[in-house]
Amino acid sequence: MKKNSHFKYIGIDPGKSGGITLINGKDIKTYKCPQRTEDMAILFSLLIGDTSSYDVKLLMERVWARPNNAVRSAFAYGVNYGQWMGIIACHEVPLQTCLPNQWISYYNCDKKLEYQERKRWLKEKAKSLYPNLNITLTTADSVLIADYAMKEHFKNEE
């Protein structure tokens, strides 16, 4: 892995049962998404600290309502996504998004896996990359999104 200079890489899985992960050199922190908007904002502020917004490389999974989602579930998902967007904008951090298949395919996850199997596979992949980090099904996606951001998505911006 090449040297990643001074950037802080943040990956966000924006669902209510998602997470946020920061990779800053060898320092890696991952958190379950807080339930309250105020707590989301506080956590984000703590993660970026006094870092210039130009030194934060943030990648959030792009979400949308799917036909098989219940209306209430899709609305809650969209609200959380919008809250993250607002918090990020208030900190003037440039936001980039990626589709789930972009970052998932980077890790060569079998596309034929059922949802729960895929979630477990991604958790194990995250654990193999960061064995000293306490990774759960809730935080695994954000860990991999941050890792993908650092190794692939922003590789030409260093």
Question: Model features per residue range: what roles?
Answer:
Residues 1-158:
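Phosphate- and other anionic-substrate recognition elements at nucleic-acid/protein interfaces
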